[in-house]
Amino acid sequence: MKYIGAHVSAAGGLANAPARAAEIGATAFALFTKNQRQWRAAPLTPQVIDDFKIACEKYLFSAAQILPHDSYLINLGHPVSEALEKSRDAFLDEMQRCEQLGLTLLNFHPGSHLMQIAQEDCLARIAESINIALAQTEGVTAVIENTAGQGSNLGFEFEQLAAIIDGVEDKSRVGVCIDTCHAFAAGYDLRTPEACEKTFAEFGKIVGFQYLRGMHLNDAKSAFGSRVDRHHSLGEGNIGHDAFRWIMQDGRFDGIPLILETINPDIWAEEIAWLKAQQIAEAVA
């Protein structure tokens, strides 16, 4: 079964996120558990935690259907010790917030070397950052998102994701989220079913589908292999509809959150309905 949704707002309280997801016909959703542009946030109160759990139950969202995202400020591979510690503390707080809310996944961008340390050293720092957070939490999987490779961001090659996973001690609590726009911009072709087969065969060989814990379904304004991160609405960008139809009709993408971060929230309901229809088309066929 496919879990399909979007990254919804938690404005006005975390309990509003499941309701907003339900309004657009979603069977999955992503959210920020705090302001993503601030380092610190007030601790979650028992009331906030209870309200969120009740709302998830009301709208039939289990933890397996929810893919929270951490702050954009965090850089788990930061080359400067003080900044690295600040990021590690913030990441631990994000993991602990998920644990308190009964969530089992936390999606994050791996990190950047900022042209100051070697790529291998940065990847090792990211893995160690994950180890530190996992050692102080229970039940939450750290989900590494592939990047477009913009600037000095790492995680744009499957080999880099595999290297981070290799450095994580508890393999049962690390996974990846593949963003289709990022993959395309990083040079993984998705424009035809044949290209999708090739790209995900490579993913399976290098990373492994056992680590796939979520996806971001985004078309790309950016050009193939451009290393530029620019999302677009499904079918409107340079990837086109075929990739998303192919994903909907492949069982390897069942049982994980498939999250839209497309640029027009006004048509998320339509995009979700279209994705669901592709799945039904497969069943009929």
Swiss-Prot record:
| The species this protein was found in | Salmonella newport (strain SL254)
Give its E.C. classification number.
3.1.21.2
What is the documented function of this protein?
Endonuclease IV plays a role in DNA repair. It cleaves phosphodiester bonds at apurinic or apyrimidinic (AP) sites, generating a 3'-hydroxyl group and a 5'-terminal sugar phosphate.
Q: Which SUPFAM superfamilies match?
A: Xylose isomerase-like
Q: Which gene encodes it?
A: nfo
The record's annotation in SMART domains points to: AP2Ec
Q: Output this protein's name.
A: Probable endonuclease 4
Q: Which residues cross the membrane?
A: none
Q: Which cofactor does it need?
A: Zn(2+)
Chain positions recorded as Zn(2+) 3 binding sites: H182, D229, H231
The molecular function terms of the Gene Ontology recorded here are: deoxyribonuclease IV (phage-T4-induced) activity; DNA binding; DNA-(apurinic or apyrimidinic site) endonuclease activity; phosphoric diester hydrolase activity; zinc ion binding
* Chain sites annotated for binding Zn(2+) 1: H69, H109, E145
